[in-house]
A protein has these predicted regions:
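Terminal membrane/secretory targeting segments in land-plant proteins
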Residues: 1-35, 347-348, 352-383
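Surface-exposed acidic, glycine-flexible loop patches that form ligand/cofactor-binding
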Residues: 27-32, 102-106, 147-162, 210-214, ...
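Structural recognition of the beta-strand scaffold that forms the well-ordered cores
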Residues: 37-41, 45-47, 84-85, 110-116, ...
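Peri-catalytic substrate-binding/gating loops that frame the active-site cleft of hydrolases
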Residues: 39-40, 50-74
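Short coil/turn segments at secondary-structure boundaries
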Residues: 51-54, 125-129, 179-183, 233-236, ...
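Mobile gating loops/cap/lid regions near enzyme active sites that modulate substrate access
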Residues: 55, 227-247, 251-254, 262, ...
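Conserved SGNH/GDSL esterase-like catalytic core that processes O-acyl groups on lipids
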Residues: 63-203, 207
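Extracytoplasmic, non-cytosolic globular domains
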Residues: 171-282
Length: 383
């Protein structure tokens, strides 16, 4: 994994020493972030504490979660950082984006993380696990944050700021893992073929992305689904019939991803004042070629029939060797692989039509559109 060392310096220094080199390639000391703010929508892959006080089985504010995070267990579903945490670092932010549940005051001007464990594109996905904040609810929460920003800055300045932010959306796994592939609890697999279900999800997802656009977003990082059939939980529950992974789950997720690419083309064509890119988390190099020796087992001890770490249990010693932290969620080490790929990969199979770094560097229409503030304070974001 030496090839990643040049991308990120020891990451925990981010929380200790301000204004340092996060990357010796991309950032300078005292440099501003490449975008002024970063908003995150998603599920447990991005959740950093929004579920902590909810009545749900999908919360992990206990040890050994956060064993490699300076603040310990925060509600992140991994041993250290999420993929979004690492992208935030690469973009040059000096602090991680706060969860909506605890974000206050001026910090929301740098962005908010709305992600919620067990959440899906569909409102009912994950409901058997308890309370969660679906994508539609996350959009409602974002509207409340916009209202606060407008109160702080005024409508015009708020509109200009929000138009320069990056919006990361990483959701959809629970619509399969905790919906379609639980036919004893949900009827989606009885109503839809995999092809029909992917089309239905994309239809709902497209509306949600357009809602973000209508609320002032202009820079979108849209993450596809990972290999959901390769998680230790999927293998244990569904079996593989001799394959390395549960192929029916991976195939279903790929149908979603295959529809997300043309959606990005459509959005870029229809909304020329915005930028949309697709990021493929399954496109990274093979785990063993990067030094990972365990790709199909969890690092921490899992309870019988479950997918989360047993509270207080002792995890594996060398976590850098494991792709998976628990039976569903990936380790800090693997999250870094995927995040760096999303940030600077030149492969169109991984980042299409451009990577996160390139998108952040593209001209922003809000930079040239200074007339909006001259139109009066009523111009700008509609809330």
């Amino acid at each position: 994994m030496a090839n990643l060392a040049s991308k990120l310096q020891p990451w925990w220094l981010l929380l200790v020493i301000p204004f340092l080199f996060v990357s010796n390639t991309y950032h300078c000391v005292n440099a501003e972030p490449q975008v002024p703010c970063y908003f995150i929508f998603g599920d447990s892959l991005s959740d950093n504490g929004n579920n902590n006080n909810l009545a749900t089985e999908a919360k992990v504010n206990y040890w050994p979660y956060g064993i490699d995070f300076p603040k310990g267990p925060t509600g992140r579903f991994t041993n250290g950082r999420t993929m979004q945490d690492i992208i935030v670092q690469l973009l040059g932010f000096q602090e991680f984006i706060p969860p909506f549940a605890t974000s206050r005051g001026q910090e929301i001007l740098k962005g908010v993380n709305y992600a919620s464990g067990s959440a899906g594109i569909l409102n009912d996905s994950g409901q058997h696990l308890g309370v969660r904040i679906s994508m539609n609810m996350q959009l409602s929460n974002h509207q409340s944050v916009i209202s606060t920003i407008v109160e702080m800055l005024g409508n015009c300045a708020a509109s200009k700021l929000l138009g320069k932010c990056m919006y990361a959306v990483q959701i959809g796994s629970n619509d399969y893992i905790n919906n379609y592939f639980k036919p004893e609890m949900y009827n989606s697999s009885h109503l839809f073929t995999p092809e029909q279900y992917a089309a239905y999800l994309i239809e709902q997802y497209s509306r949600q992305i357009k809602t973000l656009y209508n609320n002032g977003a202009r820079m979108f990082a849209l993450f596809g689904l990972g290999a959901i059939g390769c998680t230790p939980n999927a293998i244990a529950v569904h079996g593989t019939n001799g394959s390395a992974c549960v192929e029916k789950m991976n195939t279903a997720a790929q149908l979603f991803n295959e529809r997300l690419v043309p959606l990005v083309d459509e959005l870029n064509s229809n909304f020329t004042d915005a930028k949309f890119t697709y990021l493929n988390p399954t496109g990274a190099s093979a785990a063993n070629s990067l030094g990972f020796t365990v790709a199909n087992a969890s690092c921490c001890e899992i309870g019988s029939g479950g997918d989360l770490c047993i509270p207080g249990s002792e995890p594996c010693g060398d976590r850098s060797q494991y792709v998976f932290w628990d039976a569903v969620h990936t380790s800090d080490a693997w999250n870094e692989v995927i995040a760096v790929e999303a940030y600077d990969s030149e492969s169109k199979a991984i980042a299409y039509p451009f990577n996160v770094q390139k998108m952040a560097q593209l001209p922003n229409n809000n930079d040239a559109d200074g007339d909006i503030c001259e139109m009066g304070e009523n111009s700008g974001v509609t809330v």
